[in-house]
Amino acid sequence: MAGTRLQTENRIAFDAELPENTGMLAKVCSAAVNGIEAYPVEVEVNAGWGDTMVVIVGLPDAAVKESRDRVSTALTNSGFKFPMGRTTINLAPADVRKEGPSFDLPIALGMLAASEQIETDQLDHFVIVGELALTSGVRPVKGVLPLALRAQAEGKIGVLVPAENATEAAVVAGLQVIPVQNLREAARFLEGTVRIAPVKVDLDRVFEPLAEDELDFAEVKGQESVKRALEIAAAGGHNVLLIGPPGTGKSMLAKRLPTILPPLTLPEALETTKIHSIVGLLTPGQGLVTRRPFRAPHHTASDAGLLGGNINPTPGEISLAHHGVLFLDELPEFKRSVLETMRQPLEEGHVTISRAAGTMTFPAQFMLVAAMNPTPDGKMPGESRCSPREIHNYLNRISGPLLDRIDLHVEVPAVKFREITDARPGELSARIRERVMAARHRQQARFRDRPKVTCNARMGAREIKAWCRLDAPTMELLKFAMTDLNLSARAYDRILKVARTIADLAGAENITADHVSEAVQLRSLDRQIWG
């Protein structure tokens, strides 16, 4: 009994030492990006007793810690008072590292609410992000689209975002997107003393037709066989290797490939935009990426630049090309290690990056278009001064497993004089795109029960067996080609996939000998024409 009484007296004495008012607490809803998805972050601000100081906890990085100075100056320049005493800011959940300056605005609003300089009951209804300038202006931040999608999933009324990010957030249906120019405007809106019209986007008008000055296949003189090969590639989603001397138009043709691909669907556009948003590639006022990306990294690109990485993993070029085209010019000049690590993304459509900070998976479903010279000095084999061994070593910089994932090997010959001077207009990209879309529609109907198979290039062994059947004469032709033309065994499935696409372009139900014959001609390296 005596021990119990002593414990009770000690507890009463300890409680009596605490001040009656330990400060005011405010909570602001925000969010942060992990990979290409966002997760909710609760910004807790407590204005308490003690010496005037600001402490930020919850695994903030350097940019978040620096927000103390930005916020304090922005508060003063907005006409507010900097809270006296100890201000503690917690970014929850505390076990996930927080990056970037996007917490400036919610921290500042939380400090105003905790110090009773504003009165509002709206902090729980909006997700708030934004970087503060020293003048108290609100600057744009990265990753607003995934943050808006998270706000929608959390059932929030809307988001308070920098005005330059408002269009990006407004593509999310059913969400009030409030654009703010400065801290005072945001505070007065939450108090209800200032009205701000939500930004709205008409998604039906976002997907504009291609502008008249867009790149077009009609601008390319000659190279009809290469245009045909790229049409087949676009129709089936096949990867392509263009082989030819300098000046034959390889880059010019590759840059025009996106103009014959089917338009992005809304889900594709949202996923593509999320990737570009978190990297900061969206232009001010841009809501969605509505055209298929075309990325062309230099051959000196690092592993992290091409595949993604850094200390805190971010998307690389292969993810920025998601749902679009990745063009690798001078393919043999890329580091072999970089090319080899591309094999998994080419096969699976995503890339997984492991770092000390965590493991991230980024989408990477793209069409690979690579280009290379036929020999080290760029000349055709019969004109080259390189020895057969030098040519062989040059070609062998591209490994067999990587070639396994490239369906079409296309020779790009020099353009003839009569083709350069031909005044007749070439076929427009729009006409070619119509045929490509018709072939894609046939594939969508064929694979409607297999959502992971989006086009012929994505077929596995089961799909090839089911939809690439050959009659006896056609099988004999393929057998002859494999033997007589010295085709490698790895070419077999690729030829069947390409032949299926050629049949789809022709509107044919079955693969014929003509379709197989054309597919065989598109396997130059397997025919080993350079020894």
Predicted segments, located by residue:
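The Walker A (P-loop) glycine that initiates the GxxxxGKT/S ATP-binding motif of P-loop NTPases
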Residues: 244, 308, 330
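Peripheral, non-AAA+ core regions of ATP-driven protein-machinery
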Residues: 2-241, 245-251, 354, 491-492, ...
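Walker A/P-loop
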Residues: 242-281
